Amino acid sequence: MTRPTLRETVARLAPGTGLRDGLERILRGRTGALIVLGNDENVEAICDGGFALDVRYAPTRLRELAKMDGAVVLSTDGSRIVRANVQLVPDPSIATDESGTRHRSAERAAIQTGYPVISVSHSMNIVTVYVGGERHVVADSATILSRANQAIATLERYKIRLDEVSRQLSRAEIEDFVTLRDVLTVVQRLELVRRIGQVIDNDVVELGTDGRQLRLQLDELLGGNDNARELIVRDYHASPEPLSEAQMTATLDELDALSDTELLDFTALAKVFGYPTTTEAQDSAVSPRGYRALAGIPRLQFAHADLLVRSFGTLQNVLAASASDLQSIDGIGAMWARHVREGLSQLAESTITDSLS
């Protein structure tokens, strides 16, 4: 059976959920609690004492049962309270960095059973959730919103800079004057935007119903970013042939694996794209295959763009092709040939106009 992830568990504890309501009642009562979010033979094996309930979950019931010293065990889907006033006896040999008895039991139980375990501290008035070997302190909405709004402001600045360098790259593509440095600058900015977007997305998940407006802002700022990453990888990877889906995914995974420090190093980015890692190589000329430019043509399907790229090889060859040349490609009819030809002409014209404005 697949065990819940930290992200899934945090979403279950977000404002607006029944579990969060119960936890807030416990915090207001300052009684503390230990709650296991799942039940099977592994959980039963570490439970001692207490009593079976098997009643429907309700925040008020959780609050009342938490007044006892023992742990509360919920069903795996969280819909029922299975046991209460239970003493958890996990394997003491499981390593833990926690100092408090309740927190040590919670971390060990989470590791041993595979189910999330929540510890509510009555002295510090905080909620900590343990999932496997991970630990997460549940913050209040005001704290998360303040942090997320600062991150949104940073994301907006990153997005403005990304748009600038993307326009510069598009202009260089039309003029056939692209250097590897131009490409890596855009790649770096795309990845920075993606990473800060992930941080904000985690905050949105934790905010639950309180994060709806933030979700709208995030979706607007990140719209098209993942697609832009895929297109630039397809356009500029050093592979002699257009990338397969597996190769593109592997390249994106390599980008994901770069540390924040490596992301600022163009030689590390160049290595991911299959180029030499020397500083001199960054000023060398490179030619786009044309995926980015063709993606700017309305209603042109990726399959058609891929056909054109595989037939002509580079964007400059596609730009130089006439409508009849385009139509000669198997799978590109007269209508699409005219549409592509007109679209590329308009794209080149608008790019040059933008550079002059």
From Swiss-Prot:
Catalytic activity: 2 ATP = 3',3'-c-di-AMP + 2 diphosphate
Binding-site positions, ATP: 70, 88, 101-105
GO biological process terms on file: DNA repair
Enzyme Commission number(s): 2.7.7.85
Domain of life: Bacteria
Record family assignment: Belongs to the DisA family.
Database matches in NCBIfam families: PRK13482.1 (NF010009)
Protein name listed in UniProt: DNA integrity scanning protein DisA
Originating species: Mycobacterium avium (strain 104)
